[in-house]
């Protein structure tokens, strides 16, 4: 094993982290469900490429369930998945993403799961770093997640969710190409990653975004 004796603790940390990361982005209607749909479809494509039929079937079922649920969860939501639903999605994605699908290159083995789950991972990391820097508990709920930043910049819920879908899709596509291409071609993915990174940086660092004073409470999103 690449990690040796660190494999077991690293696996536990990964599963707990991803499970909670997906739960933490469930602050706007349809966000966690849509991002999980994109991630599961990314895993489905990769599983088909590497001929992992069982994983492909599981991810097809998960993506189908999310797609069926999504119309009722979009703003204005008629049904909410709650913490139980979002943590379930995070757990399944975390477990399947470390099942050994990515054996082409050592760097790819590490990079692909981080890419396809990049949005919840980076949002959670920034949230924890920000809270610690402000002397708060990392588990303290606030309104400074990436989706809250978009709302504060003047986007409505549907627009904010659409922007995050695009970022998640770019990262998912990058994960697929990285799995199916050699190292030289994989370097070209830096263009897509830089594009996604520029958008993310603008969101996270745009501290003085426009606020909608007349916005309804349900447009503000849930604190996580």
Report each predicted region and the residues it spans:
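Alpha-helical membrane-protein architecture signal
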Residues: 10, 14-17, 143-147
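Transmembrane alpha-helices and membrane-interface helical segments
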Residues: 16-20, 96-99
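Membrane-helix boundary/helix-loop-helix interface segments in multi-pass membrane proteins
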Residues: 1-13
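PRPP/pyrophosphate-binding module of the type I phosphoribosyltransferase fold
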Residues: 19-20, 29-32
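Alpha-helical transmembrane segments
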Residues: 32-224
């Amino acid at each position: 094993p690449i990690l040796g004796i660190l494999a077991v603790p690293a696996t536990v940390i990964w599963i707990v982290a991803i499970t909670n990361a997906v739960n933490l982005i469930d602050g706007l209607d349809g966000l966690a469900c849509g991002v999980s749909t994109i991630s599961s479809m990314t895993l489905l494509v990769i599983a088909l490429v590497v001929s992992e039929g069982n994983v492909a079937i599981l991810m097809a079922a998960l993506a189908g369930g999310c797609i069926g649920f999504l119309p009722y969860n979009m703003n204005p939501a008629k049904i909410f998945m709650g913490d139980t639903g979002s943590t379930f999605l995070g757990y399944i994605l975390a477990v399947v993403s470390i099942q050994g699908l990515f054996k082409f290159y050592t760097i790819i083995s590490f990079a692909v799961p981080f890419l396809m789950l990049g949005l919840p991972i980076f949002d959670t990391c920034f949230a924890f770093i920000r809270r610690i820097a402000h002397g708060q508990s990392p588990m303290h709920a606030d309104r400074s997640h990436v989706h809250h930043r978009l709302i504060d910049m003047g986007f409505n819920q549907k627009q904010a969710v659409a922007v995050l879908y695009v970022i998640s899709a770019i990262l998912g596509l990058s994960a697929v190409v990285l799995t199916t291409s050699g190292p030289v071609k994989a370097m070209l993915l830096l263009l897509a990653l830089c594009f996604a990174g520029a958008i993310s940086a603008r969101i996270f660092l745009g501290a003085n975004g426009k606020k909608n004073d007349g916005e309804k409470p349900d447009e503000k999103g849930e604190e996580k």
